[in-house]
Amino acid sequence: MDLRILSVNIGRARVIGTVHGEDVLSGIDKKAMVGDTAFVGALGINGDEQADLTVHGGVDKAVYAYPSENWPWWVTEKGIACRPATFGENLTLEGADENDVAIGDRFRWETPCSKSASRARPATSSACTPGVPMRRS
């Protein structure tokens, strides 16, 4: 498998909307790092924040990756223009999708090594992301 990192994305948690009158705090609004080195620790990438630590972050969910191979479906089926970090991912990948990666798989890019620890579930904050429908599994 030739898995490539297209983009490393980070963001700060902020209020992105309201649901049932309550502010929704989210770290979904990430931007691509440009010209910097990403330092990845046990709890994620330096400079990145997660808002709801009950479903994001921690040692088993420190970095969220999303395959660019899924973009054509979003464009065709939902009319959503995709770019790196559209779905709040820390790593925008190319060369494999969720069918090619299993929990426990390890990936190495130059020095760092990453392990697939769990499958992500959509966060409540996805409901506040413009143009991205919320899905529950």
Question: Which residue ranges define each predicted feature?
Answer:
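Electropositive, beta-rich accessory/interaction domains or terminal extensions
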Residues: 1-128, 134
